[in-house]
């Protein structure tokens, strides 16, 4: 894990407090971690789609990629954003669950398609029935960015921080 340049360390602490292991691993490339930080900040705080919906998209991607790190980190954020325990519990079967409305199901179908690498005309059409093009683009970027995050975590062998290891439900139960 890298140590940060002073300016980057200050910025990371402003945004996230103690930088998580993902940022410490990315810190081996200061220019990329700086760009990544600002882009992820924009996705988290400067978007129009509801945070709750974006967190559902992120959690579903984490399930599909079996990314324990991403799942554990975003469970806290999802709960804080208003995702219900029932939705978390039924996320792996969202398409047949009554816990999700039509808009959420359209976003989750899009999240799955983006994460798995192919958005069909049907998935796109259903998403565009619920979202205008601005929000559709946002959701596509969120799903794609967090799919990249999951893949980077795996490729770099980033371990979940000890204080984040006690979470429920476990990804393995999903």
Describe each model-derived feature in a short phrase:
Residues 1-174:
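Hydrophobic alpha-helical segments
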């Amino acid at each position: 894990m890298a140590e940060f340049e002073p300016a980057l360390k200050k910025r990371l602490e402003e945004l996230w407090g103690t930088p998580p292991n993902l940022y410490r691993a990315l810190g081996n490339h200061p220019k990329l971690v700086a760009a990544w930080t600002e882009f992820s900040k924009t996705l988290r705080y400067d978007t129009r789609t509801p945070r709750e919906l974006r967190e559902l998209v992120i959690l579903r991607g984490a399930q599909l990629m079996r990314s324990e790190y991403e799942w554990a980190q975003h469970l806290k954020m999802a709960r804080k954003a208003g995702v219900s325990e029932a939705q978390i519990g039924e996320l792996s079967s969202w398409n047949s669950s009554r816990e999700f409305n039509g808009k959420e199901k359209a976003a989750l179908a899009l999240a799955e398609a983006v994460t798995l690498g192919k958005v069909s005309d049907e998935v796109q059409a259903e998403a565009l029935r619920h979202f205008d093009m601005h929000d559709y683009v946002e959701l596509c970027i969120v799903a794609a960015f967090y799919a990249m995050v999951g893949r980077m975590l795996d490729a770099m062998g980033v371990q979940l921080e000890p204080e984040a290891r006690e979470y429920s439900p476990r990804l393995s139960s999903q």
